[in-house]
Amino acid sequence: HLVPETRIVEAIPRYGRTYRNRSSARDYVRFCRALWHGELPHSKEIKRLMALPGRDRLTTGAPSIPAGTKVMNKTGTTSHLVGDFGILVARSHSGKAVPYAIVGIVEKRSRASSFSAWTSGRGRVIRSVSDLVYRALKAQYDLV
């Protein structure tokens, strides 16, 4: 089973307000691995959609991640959760692609009083962690 820790217990309504469905960082990584290796139905199209340009919480504003680093991601935001997961394709100095999955999930038990402050603050946390991960991988894999 691809995502054994995922629980879909309610349909997602028209405006996306659902709070009881659950997944785990491990399941998001499993999804990314299967997607990268073309093991999901329509993997190529899913990767294309996830790579469409837009602001993300993984690379946008992360000072160590070079501009132009390919990112395929999906963000999610509610008054209880701010998240982003995806595949970043870094490059080594020799030009080799170095793909890696990253998942950032910040959850709050009670509804945030200021949605804007909640999302922007937690987005910065996810971005900071993504930047730290890139710096660690840069040293290990001789990334640009």
Regions found by a protein language model. Give the residues of each.
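Structured C-terminal helix/loop/strand segments within mature extracytoplasmic catalytic/sensor domains
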Residues: 31-70, 75-144
